[in-house]
Amino acid sequence: MTEKKKVVVAMSGGVDSTLTAKLLLEAGYEVCGATMHQFDGQEKEIEGARAMADFLGIPFQVVDVREAYQKFVLRYFIDAYAKGMTPNPCMMCDFKVKFGLFYDEARKHFDAPYFATGHYARILFHPERQKYEVHKGIDMGKDQSYMMYHLTQDQLAHIIFPLGRAFKKDTRRISKEKGLPTYNKAESQDICFLTSETSYVEFLKNHAPEAFSEGDIVDTKGRVLGRHRGIPYYTIGQRKGLGIAARTPLYVVALKPEKSQVIVGTNDELFRTRLLADELHFTDGEAPGEEFSCQAKIRYGIRVHDCTVTLERNGRAVVKFKEPQRAITSGQSVVFYDGDRLIGGGTIVRGL
């Protein structure tokens, strides 16, 4: 008798992860469930995941990642805002925790070669190139390939995304048809360590009150227009809540925490054709070349734009777009594609 392939499913107790586990069971895998213990106060979420594992009749394990989560996600989130950047905590959690410590520990605990999540992306093996590739999910409105540019070839050989060929609008219907009690469960929030009662500003005030020193709001010519309440209240492209009067609409075009300044300008001044990126990762393990043409996006949920990427000797890259991009934001990710295929990505240092 052929031994079943064993896979650990990252379970949250939600619609997508529960359906992922069910689909893998139906495909003949030996399925185990695991969930991350990221921070205190998660008892309800952990028990929800455990309940779904029990419902499916699969073994379940909680993996304590609190120390790594504190270091790589919470500390990063706080430090980024203090530096005038707009962090991407979900990306960092995937990179350092979910597909880092959790990926390693969950597979080790169950002695399982495979690891699956409910992400909407596809992993394909290209026989001619002898490379694993990440491709966009077929549901372009839900595609999460943007989050996967840090994955290595070794990881891609052991990761399964069963929902990559599904449409989000169908997952609740399919879940209901399969008798899964999660079919009508609400979607999870974007930043999991924030509650409905705690905004990111309140969180930062509790953990980094020094970041909220007041300062000047100045225009691009250096003229003082007013006062701001603290750098973390503002992000690139913001118009509302500036508290200044002007004849034309003004937007945040830059943040200078070292001077405690918020720089404002016109909508036209938000556009840049170039950006500088660092912390680069490429799915193939190396870049396509020292200079290459591709498509890129500068934040999740927008369309890609044609560009040229030029690598620098210091490990950074200059990305030049054919069309100006609005509100290039330090701390967000720029991600590169060749059609549907993910090439890689990096962290935006600043617009140029």
For each predicted feature, which ranges?
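ATP-dependent adenylation/nucleotidyltransferase module used to activate substrates
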Residues: M1-Y149, I160, K169-D170, K176
